């Protein structure tokens, strides 16, 4: 496995799945159970999609942002403040699975 992204731990855990970059309401509705939700930030509109995600990675935010708080409530692993997440993880979207290891705030590409 190769580390491809690093951010800040927000909700501990580990998950593996395909990436789904979420930019619109349609993307949220199409997020499948077990996918890795990747977004700039989340809002209350994202909660249903967040509950289906295996893990959440956001480009912005800190330990008290929406993604961090809701992911802890849902028990979903979450990394926030992962600058460049949409661009970097967008490259592997639907192609290979990634492993999110929140303890170190790291995302790895599975080979």
Question: How does the language model describe each region?
Answer:
Residues 2-35, 40-111:
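Acidic, glycine-rich flexible loop/linker segments
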